[in-house]
Amino acid sequence: MNERIADIAEKVLNGSLIERNEIEYLFSIDDGLWDLLYWANQIRQKNFGNKVKICSIVPGRLGGCSQDCKFCAQSSRYETAFQETKTLTDEQILDAAREAKQKGVPHFGIVYSGKTISEKELAKLEKLIPKIKNEIGISVCGGFGIIDYKQAQRLAKAGLSRYNHNLETSRNHFKNIVTTHDYDARIETVKGAKKAGLGLCTGGIFGIGESDADRIDMALQIRELGVDMVPMNFLYPIAGTPLGGLATMQPREILRLIALYRFILPKTGIKVAGGRVLNLRDMQSWMFYAGATSILSGNYLTTAGRAVEQDLKMISDLGLQAELI
């Protein structure tokens, strides 16, 4: 066993946060995957036990986005199946929430495409969110793009429990992926949501040409923001997007990244989200041993996921416990 990995892991297990030089060492190791996984699992078990959180999402508004995120099929700038905007009715969203609840999913997310939401859409959500909570009895999360503090306050007052807004990548690499808004707009959205009392679900996407330095930068930025959950998405190359020709990530590389993020963010939830099925393939169950504590189950926004029933069975087979409240 690599003694330096063990020493760094013991530091984390004793309650300390690791420094950048230690993080860079962990990222530099070529043959330490199994040691990383072993210790990441120890860190997960100490801070989270064997509990796993599950959530499902529904696209309240899909496609037709004005922004140019190079990985995203929903941008109107690229020739994909989602150039036109499709908006679900309140009843369709309620039906999706009922289905999620029936399948045993305790957290239900509503996600809107686009840079932000209009006043009309916000007013609609102020009525819909409490209806979902009170009539169906399920926790409601949301991702509605770039919002300000006052909008976040209104969502919190309506009963939204957590706001999803990803950084996507590091500040340095962001300009290579998005040009229609800047990194600070995302940072300010996260800070405003936190100030309003909303929980934070903030992570990014991997496999988009970023370096290990970018991955470290994003992890440290997330740590500084003090978020509650870090969704880790892995590129699902979509034909027609600028990144549609990139290769998918290898399962072992993904497990390595999950483990490294567990070292950096020992007490923060880590959710394996978009691209899980395509990229991890037969190694999906290993994500928990690598330090993950949560999964996005069911379909994603523009790609197929895995049935909730299959995920619940996987969690049970591993001797883990799905949190159903």
Language-model segments: what does each one mean?
Residues 77-96, 100-190, 198-203, 228-233, ...:
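Core AdoMet radical
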Residues 48-57, 65-66, 70-79, 126-133, ...:
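Mobile, glycine- and charge-enriched loop segments
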Residues 148-157, 209-221, 278-290:
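Catalytic cores of alpha/beta
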Residues 1-31, 95, 223-325:
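Auxiliary Fe-S-binding modules of radical SAM enzymes
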Residues 35-78, 88-109:
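N-terminal pre-triad scaffold of radical SAM enzymes
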Residues 15, 40, 69, 165, ...:
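Conserved, mostly hydrophobic/aromatic
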Residues 58-60, 114-116, 144-148, 169-171, ...:
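Active-site-proximal loop/turn and secondary-structure-junction residues that shape catalytic pockets
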Residues 199, 203-204, 213-216, 223:
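Conserved mixed alpha/beta catalytic, RNA-binding, or beta-rich assembly cores of soluble enzyme
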